[in-house]
Amino acid sequence: MRKKQKLPFDKLAIALMSTSILLNAQSDIKANTVTEDTPVTEQAVETPQPTAVSEEVPSSKETKTPQTPDDAEETIADDANDLAPQAPAKTADTPATSKATIRDLNDPSQVKTLQEKAGKGAGTVVAVIDAGFDKNHEAWRLTDKTKARYQSKEDLEKAKKEHGITYGEWVNDKVAYYHDYSKDGKTAVDQEHGTHVSGILSGNAPSETKEPYRLEGAMPEAQLLLMRVEIVNGLADYARNYAQAIRDAVNLGAKVINMSFGNAALAYANLPDETKKAFDYAKSKGVSIVTSAGNDSSFGGKTRLPLADHPDYGVVGTPAAADSTLTVASYSPDKQLTETAMVKTDDQQDKEMPVLSTNRFEPNKAYDYAYANRGMKEDDFKDVKGKIALIERGDIDFKDKVANAKKAGAVGVLIYDNQDKGFPIELPNVDQMPAAFISRKDGLLLKDNPQKTITFNATPKVLPTASGTKLSRFSSWGLTADGNIKPDIAAPGQDILSSVANNKYAKLSGTSMSAPLVAGIMGLLQKQYETQYPDMTPSERLDLAKKVLMSSATALYDEDEKAYFSPRQQGAGAVDAKKASAATMYVTDKDNTSSKVHLNNVSDKFEVTVTVHNKSDKPQELYYQATVQTDKVDGKHFALAPKVLYEASWQKITIPANSSKQVTVPIDASRFSKDLLAQMKNGYFLEGFVRFKQDPTKEELMSIPYIGFRGDFGNLSAVEKPIYDSKDGSSYYHEANSDAKDQLDGDGLQFYALKNNFTALTTESNPWTIIKAVKEGVENIEDIESSEITETIFAGTFAKQDDDSHYYIHRHANGEPYAAISPNGDGNRDYVQFQGTFLRNAKNLVAEVLDKEGNVVWTSEVTEQVVKNYNNDLASTLGSTRFEKTRWDGKDKDGKVVANGTYTYRVRYTPISSGAKEQHTDFDVIVDNTTPEVATSATFSTEDRRLTLASKPKTSQPVYRERIAYTYMDEDLPTTEYISPNEDGTFTLPEEAETMEGATVPLKMSDFTYVVEDMAGNITYTPVTKLLEGHSNKPEQDGSGQTPDKKPEAKPEQDGSDQAPDKKPEAKPEQDGSGQTPDKKPETKPEKDSSGQTPGKTPQKGQPSRTLEKRSSKRALATKASTRDQLPTTNDKDTNRLHLLKLVMTTFFFGLVAHIFKTKRQKETKK
């Protein structure tokens, strides 16, 4: 075996670094917080498809940030920022008695009122299931341990023994139990997330804390059960592990369990039975499970708006999809505890403004600042030396703005927003440079202020937010994949200050932060009900608390759209502990099942019936009214904003004491249907709230959300139409080449995981060098050393010419793609396999092949579950899924190759929504194993080095490529290049080849081979020496045209038909598509593609056309099978890692070779 080609060290280092980055992007557990660890680049919204969202939100390990107008290339930190702790401001320690809690300053959910009635959780146990914890944080403290449920380690061990729990440790009086359910024996890498979540639920920092304000959770006196669960052996095992944690938490006395993690778009039906039983067990014992909705926004993630033709754009997944859980969305309140800065305005008034710092400025120091435009040009920074640079957001990455300012001598950076009412953004840390983000309003004030001086305050304060009260952009929308209403309720989740590892505190954002606040409120409300309703069972009190909490929530209103945020985004509204604690009434659906109304499919006219419950001893007089609204549409996309249709008039009702009464509200949206169907042809949501007040002029007392779908929701299309059918060549995740809409490149030489995402059929293109090697007896493809590689391409695509590495759809006259295969075992277009962009979750996917009579000749194995391709992001999921089980090798049920002809390749699947019927996608596939017949003789002119064949090739399918190949040694790698025919059909043979280092290698006639390939992938090849021998007994000549002194006796060389060159192959009768031999078949003219060109034919060529981009060593071939692998349909992160590792390493080798040959080609061009 030849010595392997050495790889340049720097290229290897780059590849390994890229692999590391991509693998690190695959989070084991998708905690519902997002980090600024992986900055991303914003792109302009002018791209026609997919459209970018216009709202900005700060940082995510899991998803990319939304695009905004004016921000062409800007790296930002996403708005759900996970692990970005801030260093505490430099402040002097305050006496313990003066330390206020964070809630004393700002309590948008009014928890303090509930605490006054129900206490702070003393004697109660709460559980947090999460990825990791700092078990010894200073905030894990009880004020009076004599009131604790577990007084000692011995008490805990007794409880464990009663329930057969043989694991778990006592940490201290506060953390009564800790256990790692992942069983991986590793210390949690992420201790931040679980610590932050636990602090919101039950933190209780000491007065001696160095922070200016003391952290106090919703239930600060409750004991904690900390349960670490992380993905180790796949999602199913993961779900079983947290199911065990749920059972243990219930058995150890937890009243509430918080689960701030999830897997987007997974359906409840996908969970193992053990997990479903654990949810039911907790419910039966009256234990509340609170989950976060997720940070995946909607279908398309945070970088794309969903298409208005596909209304099933919800992405709330598991465990949040479980009906028994209380699922929490995130919103930003109108006021926030924040760092502040002070300036004097032109009228000498002090102006205080909120700032979000990355590296804090020295407090109480007056800084000069200078305006630096958008921080792009050197001239922008002419006045910033020794000052703070004030820079507008936009055009370039934040890190570049900061770096440019530092290079110019600035001492810090202030970046202000380029849009009104935006969320604050965490800026990247650039060499510890002090930097902060401010609102557009404040930035413009600083720009125009004549006094260019600013001071940063030492102590944070509560100030109005620039965004106002608004649902967080990242917060995941419903419905669930099963078609159920989620989320249930909303809570503050934007820039929440809580505990992180090592006795520190930080602001993080995400639905992970929203859930533990609601968990604490639920725990306190149930505690209140123990006294208020002593005759109820724990499960009855749990049911009541959930209904009251949702009923008393305040529906959030979008001031910009003058409509309520959708119930599919906010659930019942913003949690209000004060209203819940005082509530004597609540509202449910007509069956008293839950405090939300799911109407499923509706017509233009329908009714909403709800039940109002009065638990007081007096009759209650109420006024009620319904809002009717739908989705706002912007062009072809949902704007992810509400659109009000109308509001019904207020009506009056009296509810008897200790009784209930039904209310029916008629809805008539018929006058809007024509316009709405024109915007949303596949149907639309009609939704809103039925709201109740004690007086029409007063604030809302309670409300209930309702959702109906005007159309057939269950039978919405589950799969995007094939890319072959796209009029403009684009799909949701695929942007067409504007100059060649039918261009569809295979996986070959670049990392196409983020690009080739559409519905199509895949196949493989195998070069003749590998086919020849296999025919000559090489059993292991890894032992083949060749500059060519096997590529995964898309069926029906072909390269137009050898020096164009791109593939293009070739179509029949009727516009259908020319998808043809030749299942003869040579690895070249031998199979087809389904790849789909799923718009919805589906089940029971199966492929089958039908002959022209409609008989099923082959059926694949079943793929039971398919998850919608809700994003195109390495950290979450890709924009399409390949299904290995659907690979058809052109054989029937008995394993025999089918007869030549045209077949229907059908993929069947069923959406998992209730009432859905089976759907299918069809492709026409030609099967043809007819070997091309080629000339048996040729002549060669030594004068102009032209090779002239005696006849044209005869093929059953149109000729794809007719070429002369030659192979030479470039160092230790056999290198193959090709010559296309001249306009007259002759070939001009070169005398020598050039290596990558510029050396020349003489070519002999025996180095050349005539290769013909048809569009089904049938290949025939013949040595040129054989063709010349077929014409005369001319001795072999070397590259100079001279006769060698002595020609060694050669063994008979085989051509592509396995015949010896001294024996003319017997021509077999050519068969037509039915397998019958026609009386006479005329020579097939090459079929032209949609551009009028014949694939593979290059006019006026004849010179060597190098397959430069396709060169690779055998090390790359070893990974070729990875492109066939089915991408995970269960969102399994561990499996994703393996697939991505293969793809990345393949990319490295292909990309390296492409780079080397690109450099070589550039050198040749300069000559």
From Swiss-Prot:
> Which one Pfam family would you cite for this protein?
ScpA_C
Do you know which PROSITE patterns this protein is assigned to?
A: GRAM_POS_ANCHORING, SUBTILASE, SUBTILASE_ASP, SUBTILASE_HIS, SUBTILASE_SER
> What are the Basic and acidic residues biased-composition ranges?
1044-1071, 1078-1090
Quote the catalytic residue positions: D130, H193, S512
Renumbered to this chain, motif LPXTG sorting signal spans: 1127-1131
Record PTM text: Cleaved by SpeB protease; leading to its degradation. Degradation by SpeB is probably strictly regulated to preserve integrity of C5a peptidase.
Please give the residue positions where the record annotates the modification Pentaglycyl murein peptidoglycan amidated threonine. T1130
Say if the entry is tagged with keyword Cell membrane. no
Q: Which reaction does it catalyse?
A: The primary cleavage site is at 67-His-|-Lys-68 in human C5a with a minor secondary cleavage site at 58-Ala-|-Ser-59
Could you give a single Gene Ontology term from the biological process aspect?
proteolysis
Give a GO molecular function annotation for the protein.
Answer: toxin activity
Which residues belong to any copy of the Peptidase S8 domain?
99-581
Its Gene Ontology cellular component terms are: extracellular region; membrane
Asked if Signal is a keyword of the record, the answer is yes
Stretches the record annotates as Disordered: 34-73, 1029-1133
Q: Which residues form the signal peptide?
A: 1-31
Entry keywords, A to Z: Cell wall, Hydrolase, Peptidoglycan-anchor, Protease, Repeat, Secreted, Serine protease, Signal, Virulence
Q: Which InterPro entries match?
A: C5a/SBT2-like_Fn3, C5a_Peptidase, Ig-like_fold, LPXTG_anchor, PA_dom_sf, PA_domain, Peptidase_S8/S53_dom, Peptidase_S8/S53_dom_sf
Q: What class of enzyme is it?
A: hydrolase
- sequence repeats, residue ranges: 1034-1050, 1051-1067, 1068-1084, 1085-1101
- Per the UniProt entry, the propeptide covers 1131-1167
State the compartments where it is located.
Secreted, Cell wall
Q: Region labeled 4 X 17 AA tandem repeats — which residues?
A: 1034-1101
Query: What family is reported?
Result: Belongs to the peptidase S8 family.
Indicate what this protein is called per its UniProt record: C5a peptidase
Species in which this protein is naturally found: Streptococcus pyogenes
Gene behind this protein: scpA
